[in-house]
UniProtKB/Swiss-Prot annotation:
Reactions it catalyzes: Cleavage of peptide bonds with very broad specificity
One GO cellular component, as annotated: cytoplasm
GO molecular function, one term: threonine-type endopeptidase activity
Protein name: Proteasome subunit beta
InterPro entries: Ntn_hydrolases_N, Proteasome_sua/b, Proteasome_suB-type, PSB_actinobac
Length: 279
């Protein structure tokens, strides 16, 4: 750090000021150009200038919540990436998945992770799950300008509510619109270009009493159906051994479902569809 002219190497004053516990607000005051929504862009629609991530699904289960995402990113009518990861742990008990402009989405996830960690370090306690969801809504509002130029990012947020009376009611799912509106979903939700097909699949198959293993299978079934009708969504790729990314958030924390388990479930789903293509 440059410090000041009087005391070279000293921490700059903005870092020592007492403010909020928000890392995003701190970054906005000391280096606003690093925030995605503050970067200058040329006029016009830039939606086809970068790869886009597609379909994410989340559903509640007896132990908490399951979130899954396909691995494809597209740019216009081309497949730009076949193995992108679009679902991540936000912190110890919550998950985030992104659809929309892939690069900005991954950057938003990293910034959101830093925001939650920064708050916990300063306050000594983690935000409530709803507080985390509201933090994410504020970040989306900050990106409204570039979203209007075709570089929108829409996340899906879910987690295990440690304040819930029991595990069966602890799984919560939050969706957003492009202006930062936040909506809690009761049972399941999906975002991205294949979301209408994924939600239709879950509407037929979802039951209120499912464990995490069954919820994982339902999520993969939903992504398979989305890929069947939406060219921007990638289904299980048996040839390349590329399968959906799946995370769970339970009382044990946010964990990735092992790749070997996802491969076994994906192969079982594909084999079943050979017998009954419509599921």
């Amino acid at each position: 750090m440059s410090g000041t002219a009087e005391f070279p190497g000293r921490i700059p004053a903005p870092y020592l000021e007492v403010g909020s516990s928000s890392f995003v607000e701190l970054l906005g005051s000391v280096a606003p150009e690093l925030l995605p929504g503050r970067r200058p862009l040329p006029p016009g629609d830039m939606g086809d200038a970068a790869p886009h991530g597609t379909t994410i699904v989340a559903l509640r289960c007896n132990e908490g919540v399951v979130m899954a995402g396909d691995r494809r990113a597209t740019q216009g009518n081309m497949i730009s990436l076949r193995d992108i990861q679009k679902v991540f742990p936000a912190d110890a008990y919550s998950l985030i998945g992104i659809a929309g402009t892939a690069g900005l989405g991954v950057e938003m996830i990293r910034l959101f992770q830093a925001e939650l960690e920064h708050f916990e370090k300063l306050e000594g306690n983690a935000l409530s799950l709803h507080g985390k969801a509201n933090k994410l809504a504020n970040m989306i509002r900050g990106n409204l300008g570039i979203a209007m130029q075709g570089l929108a990012v829409l996340p899906l947020f879910a987690g295990f509510d440690t304040d819930a009376p029991d595990a069966a009611s602890a799984g919560r799912i939050f969706s957003y619109d492009v202006v930062g509106g936040i909506y809690e979903e009761r049972e399941y939700d999906a975002i991205g270009s294949g979301s209408i097909f994924a939600k239709s699949a879950l509407k037929k198959r979802f039951q209120s009493e499912v464990d995490a293993t069954e919820a994982t299978r339902l999520a993969i079934e939903a992504l398979y159906d989305a890929a069947d009708d939406d060219s921007a969504t990638g289904g299980p790729d048996l040839t390349r051994k590329l399968f959906p990314t799946v995370f769970t958030a339970t009382a044990d924390g946010a964990k990735r479902v092992p790749d070997a388990e996802i491969e076994a479930v994906s192969r079982a789903v594909v084999a079943a569809r050979l017998e009954n293509p419509g599921g």
